Curated annotation (Swiss-Prot):
FAD binds at A181, G201, T206, K216, D472, V480. InterPro entries: FAD/NAD-bd_sf (IPR036188), FAD/NAD-binding_dom (IPR023753), FAD/NAD-linked_Rdtase_dimer_sf (IPR016156), Heavy-metal-associated_CS (IPR017969), HMA_dom (IPR006121), HMA_dom_sf (IPR036163), Mercury_reductase_MerA (IPR021179), Pyr_nuc-diS_OxRdtase (IPR001100). GO terms for molecular function: flavin adenine dinucleotide binding; mercury (II) reductase (NADP+) activity; mercury ion binding; NAD(P)H dehydrogenase (quinone) activity; NADP binding; oxidoreductase activity, acting on a sulfur group of donors, NAD(P) as acceptor. It is an enzyme of class 1 (oxidoreductase). GO terms for biological process: detoxification of mercury ion. Hg(2+) binds at C628, C629. This is Mercuric reductase. Disulfide bonds join C207-C212. The keyword Repeat applies. PROSITE patterns: HMA_1 (PS01047), HMA_2 (PS50846), PYRIDINE_REDOX_1 (PS00076). Keywords: Disulfide bond, FAD, Flavoprotein, Mercuric resistance, Mercury, Metal-binding, NADP, Oxidoreductase, Redox-active center, Repeat, Transposable element. Its EC number is 1.16.1.1.
Length: 631
């Protein structure tokens, strides 16, 4: 074998690395390492294969190969090892420059220093010890910490070659057709895999069919109806009559159909993978049975999602209750709606029907809404919902549920007192359970956890290394954007031969109530539990000019920072369009920005996002004493 380095232009991301790697593998290359940042591919070829063939393969993949360099065996000493080194004592970009110069003088290459994250990335020749770099940093008056050697192979292609595994019907079978499934299929097709997707029901999964899309369009309708009846401006004589729910639901269903076709169904032919309709179950680790036919694949992805689950309350099974799916198909607004469960689904759908005209009561076992959130967030949304007229029942013990004609009765005990809550409709919104019981997972050696979730490792592999899983059927945050991220990563690992870890350290979440709730990073309590010395800022919404002009001032901004480094650890918001605000905070948390970084960054006036800037100023100032935009 001969080893080569080829310069490659046109790569912009890790996906490009995979495309180049697949192209090289298909023409016979081995030990492939592609790096889009350095713009190069390193690989081995049999002695009888010309490097020009490899360059042609790269060109056929729509990238631009440059000069090729053959490695001689003695050249290993010229190769580089890559390190990540924690560094304390940096406070600004000037510190970054000092460390970069020190490392360069020690022989390091490819140096990247980030004072916000407190780390340095660099490469050293194989024969240079890491202690030389650490000594150079110490001599520059900074404090080096632990050094981690970044094994290029750990995130590059493994020795997996699907071409060597025998004959199968498909390279990749995906069970499910939601966000994780489609993301994975698209990525796998880009890696030249033959892909099939199996779906027993409606294509598109929860989000587009019965979750995000239908609920959010109806929530918007409810907000407009509520504002028409309760607008805060004098001189505007608005009103709203009773809601005709049937045509509103039809409009919602038309939108769902349109988005399902555009974002899911039509993509099947666009990308060229196969859809198989039917129930699937594993026969063994390489085979599933669908509609009586056995189908084989080299790799599988289980992305079957989750469904509503009901609590164990006596009498509930005998009551005609609603789920989040069936509620959105009602053709008439009920006079009264009781909601068991006050998580994000219960709050959103409860407020929706309150805004459409129902008398709504939310019931939950815990003493406060969103008990896993910071108290300030719970207090703000509790105040908002109660101000709007929604009934909140907390600290409830459920005794039984019964139906008396058309009336559903929920018997609870609160602080030792019995109470019966009656309504024409009862919504159960107490959580979701993974969908996997019909898959016959034991036949494939796939284990599940105590909740029925599929057990996966950091690379999205199940307990069978040929079978991966992603999305709501696994542990972790149940958001469609998380599912899509995991689905793409699963394909890169399963088909692309990579070994990339899933990273869910910084995941924003939004509850689409009005005001909405958005959060990212650590709460104050979580930060303390992780050992941080914490500094917090709490800004009431009536200190944000946008809220004042909107005449909607119930809400809060809260920031959590590391008291030592002032890095932003978490951001939590209750405000109009909080979900649109939280992305900026997500970037701050992910990239280790500090309170100072945000303080020195301008925010446009009269936007809700300005609340982040004002919350930053609140760490050190009383913003009520500042003029507009002063900081």
């Amino acid at each position: 074998m001969k080893k080569y380095r080829v310069n490659v232009q046109g790569m912009t991301c890790s996906g490009c690395e995979q495309h180049v790697a697949v192209a090289l593998e298909n023409m016979g290359a081995k030990a492939i390492e592609v790096d889009f940042r350095r713009g190069e591919a390193v690989f081995e070829l049999p002695d009888d294969v010309k490097v020009e063939d490899a360059k042609n393969a790269i060109a056929d993949a729509n990238y631009h190969p440059g000069e090729a360099e053959e490695f001689q065996s003695e050249q290993k000493t010229n190769l580089l090892k890559k390190y990540r080194l924690n560094v304390e004592g940096m406070t600004c970009t000037g510190c970054e420059e000092h460390i970069a110069v020190a490392l360069e003088n020690a022989g390091a290459k490819g140096i990247e220093v980030d004072f916000r994250r407190g780390e340095a990335l660099f490469e050293l020749p194989y024969d240079v010890d890491i202690d030389i770099a650490k000594t150079a940093i110490t001599d520059a008056q900074y404090q080096p910490g632990e050094a981690e050697e970044i094994q290029v192979q750990s995130e590059k292609r493994t020795d997996v070659s699907l071409n060597d595994e025998g004959n199968y019907d498909y390279d990749y079978i995906i069970i499910g057709s939601g966000g994780a499934a489609f993301s994975s299929a698209i990525e796998a097709v880009a890696l030249n895999a033959k892909v099939a997707m199996i779906e027993r029901g409606t294509v598109g999964g929860t989000c587009v069919n019965v979750g995000c899309v239908p609920s959010k369009t109806l929530l918007r309708a409810g907000e407009i109806n509520h504002l028409a009846k309760n607008n805060p401006f004098v001189g505007l004589h608005t009103s709203a009559s009773n809601v005709d729910l049937a045509p509103l639901v039809k409009q919602k269903n038309d939108l769902v159909t349109e988005m399902r076709n555009e974002k899911y169904v039509n993509l099947i032919d666009d990308y060229g993978f196969e859809l198989i309709k039917g129930e699937s179950k594993f026969v063994n680790e390489n085979t599933v049975e669908v509609n009586g036919n056995q189908i084989t694949a080299k790799r599988f992805l289980i992305a079957t999602g989750a469904s509503s689950t009901a609590p164990n309350i006596p009498g509930l099974d005998e009551v005609d209750y609603l789920t989040s799916t069936s509620l959105l198909e009602l053709k008439k607004v009920p006079n009264r709606l009781t909601v068991i469960g006050s998580g994000y689904i219960g709050m959103e759908l409860g407020q929706l029907f309150h805004n459409l005209g129902s008398e709504v009561t939310l019931i939950q076992r815990s003493e406060r809404l969103l008990k896993e959130y910071d108290p300030e967030i719970s207090e703000a949304i509790t105040k908002a919902l109660t101000e709007q007229g929604i009934n909140l029942v907390t600290g409830a013990t459920y005794e039984r549920v019964e139906q008396d004609g058309d009336i559903k009765k929920v018997h609870v005990e609160i602080n030792g007192k019995k109470r019966i809550i009656e309504a024409e409709q009862l919504l159960i919104a107490t959580g979701r359970k993974p969908i996997q019981t019909s898959l016959n997972l034991h036949a494939a050696g796939v284990e599940v956890g105590s909740r029925g979730e599929i057990v996966i490792d950091d690379y999205l592999k199940t307990t069978n290394s040929r079978i991966y899983s992603a999305g709501d059927v696994t542990p972790g945050p149940q958001f469609v954007y998380v599912a899509a991220y995991e689905g793409g990563l699963a394909a890169r690992n399963a088909i692309g031969g990579l070994n990339q870890k899933v990273n869910l350290e910084v995941v924003p979440g939004v509850t689409f109530t009005s005001p909405s709730i958005a959060t990212v990073g650590l709460t104050e309590q979580q930060a303390k539990e992780k050992g941080y010395e914490v500094k917090t800022s709490v800004l009431p919404l009536d200190a944000v000019p946008r809220a004042l002009v909107n005449r909607e001032t119930t809400g809060v901004f809260k920031l959590v920072a590391d008291a030592k480094t002032l890095k932003v650890l978490g951001a939590h918001v209750v405000a109009e369009n909080a979900g649109d605000v939280i992305y900026a905070a997500t970037l701050a948390v992910k990239f280790g920005l500090t309170v100072g970084d945000l303080r020195e960054t301008m925010a446009p006036y009269l936007t809700m996002a300005e609340g982040l800037k004002l919350a930053v100023l609140t760490f050190d100032k009383d913003v009520s004493k500042l003029s507009c935009c002063a900081g």
